[in-house]
Amino acid sequence: MKKLVSIAALLLIIASFSLFIYRPAKETIIFFPIHPHVTFSEAKTTLQLQPQKRDGKYSLLWSAASSLDRDAYLRQDISLLFADGRLVDRLAKWKTNSQTLTQEKIVAARDSRFFQAISFHHGELHEGEMITSSQTMTSDYLYVIDSPYSPLVSFHRAATQDEKEWQNVLNKTTAEFLQHTSESLLSHFSIQKQQYYSLYLPDLIVYNEQPLPDLSMEKTQEIIGKLWEGLYKSYFLGIKKEDGSILSPIGSTTPLILISKDYSHLLVLTETKDGEKIRLTQQISR
C-alpha cells in the first residue's frame, strides 16, 4: 500500500512539473533574436471574392500561408482582417517541428467595403541552448462593390471610371472614420501626437523592407517582433483591460500604432465595438 502511495505521489510531482514547464504555444508568440540565415521561402496573404451570393451576402476567401526554409521548433501564423476601419475576423495556426503553415476562411459580408488583411509569420528555432526566431509580414487588400445598380465586383486596383469612383468613396469613408476615432482616442488619453511616429496596423507592412527612422533594420525588426508579441497577447486573443477583464477585439477599430520618436515606448490605441477606448503600452529596450 505504501509503495502504491509513493508511486502516486511521484506521478503527481512529475505531472505538476510538466504543467509548470509547458508553454501553451497558442497563447504566446515570443520574440527572440533574429536568426541571420533563416528566411521564409514563401509567405502570402490573399483576399478573393467568391462568385455567388447567398441570402443577400457575398463571400470572401481569406487565406494566409508561409513556408520557412527549414523546420522550426515552433511555427506560428496569425492574420487580422479589417473592413472599413474595423476588425472583422481573426486567423491563427501553430505547429511544432514544421516548416509550412496554411490556413483559410470564408467570410460572409454585405454592402460595398474596403477590406484589409495583415499577417505575421513567425518561426521559433532551437539550436542547442540557443533560441532564435525568423519573422515576416504579408498583407492584401480588396475593394468589393455590392450595389443594387451594378453586378457584384471586386478589384485591387481600379481599372474603370466606376471603380475609381467607388475606390475614392471607400478610401475617403475609411480614412475619415479612422481620423475621427484617432482624434477622439488621442484627446481621451491626452497624447501629444507630434511626439510619435504614427501609423495604422495594416501600414506596418512597409517596415518589412525598410527601417524605422534613424534605426537599423535589426532594431526595427526587434521592435516589430515585440509589437506583434504584445498584439497577440493583448489584442488578438482578447483586449485586456486594466482591471483584468477581457473584451473581444471583433468590431474594434483598426489599431493606431504610436512609436515614440525617442524610441522609449510605443502605444496601441483602439476603440472596442461598444465604444470603450483602449490604450496598450509597451516599453522599448535600448
For each of these PLM feature ranges, what is it?
Residues 111-116, 120-135, 273-276:
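Short acidic/polar inter-strand loop motif in beta-rich domains
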Residues 1-49:
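Gram-positive cell-envelope targeting signals
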Residues 128-166:
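Short beta-strand elements
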Residues 171-263:
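Intrinsically disordered, low-complexity segments enriched in Gly and acidic/Ser/Thr residues
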Residues 85-100, 228-241:
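Solvent-exposed serine/threonine-rich low-complexity stretches and specific carbohydrate-binding patches
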Residues 55, 66-69, 80-85, 109-111, ...:
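Beta-strand elements of well-folded, non-transmembrane domains
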Residues 99-110:
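Exposed aromatic-hydrophobic patches
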Residues 39-79, 173-185, 189:
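Short, surface-exposed binding/anchoring microloops in extracellular/periplasmic proteins
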